[in-house]
């Protein structure tokens, strides 16, 4: 499962809550969490870019190229996953791993059980949408093709 346009779909209010949650878990709260949240708000709300002599301001979500973007997105997705997995009460895939906005999983669930899980995930947050691929033979993850042949996993990654 891949998040569709993760950086441009995280509403500020939904992203700042997990950021504050994880900052409050630091062993040493220095600088203070409220100060870091205010700085994050400035980055999110005052980000501008110039293109062909015009200046544009990012009004919502995370601007591409922002230094804090990947970490912010990971915290948001980690919090979202944790919350949705706690709330989902039906059978779920045995394996699911994610790298920022790209996920991969494996399961022995029936096709219908898997679709129930995917539909729950798809509808969990109004701004976050996923694309997905279901296959018994192979999937692509992070530009790598992972295949299941004769009971063994194999992978192929084209040369860079």
Residue ranges and their predicted role:
Residues 1-120, 124, 133-141, 149:
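Conserved polymerase palm-domain catalytic core
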Residues 147, 151-160:
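C-terminal, non-catalytic extensions of nucleic-acid polymerases
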């Amino acid at each position: 499962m891949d998040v569709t346009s993760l950086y441009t779909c995280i509403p500020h209010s939904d992203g700042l809550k997990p950021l504050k949650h994880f900052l409050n878990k630091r062993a040493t709260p220095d600088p203070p969490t409220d100060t870091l949240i205010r700085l994050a708000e400035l980055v999110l709300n005052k980000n501008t870019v110039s293109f062909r002599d015009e200046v544009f301001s990012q009004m919502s979500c995370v601007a591409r190229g922002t230094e804090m973007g990947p970490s912010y997105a990971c915290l948001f997705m980690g919090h979202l996953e944790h919350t949705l997995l706690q709330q989902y009460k039906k059978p779920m895939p045995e394996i699911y791993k994610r790298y920022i906005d790209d996920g991969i999983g494996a399961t022995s669930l029936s096709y219908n059980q898997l679709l129930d899980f995917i539909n729950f995930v798809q509808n969990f947050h109004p701004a976050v949408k996923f694309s997905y691929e279901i296959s018994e033979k192979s999937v692509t993850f992070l530009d790598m093709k992972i295949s299941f042949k004769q009971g063994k996993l194999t992978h192929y990654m084209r040369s860079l």
